[in-house]
């Protein structure tokens, strides 16, 4: 009887851990989608190219189908960010430096998607890279790769 109760509690706590991991993964995806969506809004000229590039970034980072990536970006767009600290802290906690650098590269790709880098886009990516603790050299290398120079 005691063993059966222990097994039930173990299953319940294991289920809770699985739900927590799923919730954490969703938080991470929403944080990344939120930053990509903000990147599309920075220059006030949201084009199809920027949206497609942001979707490709989500697909590349998380292996999602295009429709799910678009849905996450749409959901992130409906929730206006009031601070970049919350998504940045979630991303810092859950992604390695290499993965955060890939995110910065994806932000640069969205910035360059319309073939015109706005000064506000440049400032935004640098600010986010700083919040993510991505070193400036890595940020600039990511910029070159996104531009097709590296």
Residue ranges and their predicted role:
Residues 1-38, 42-150:
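Small-residue-enriched hydrophobic alpha-helices in membranes
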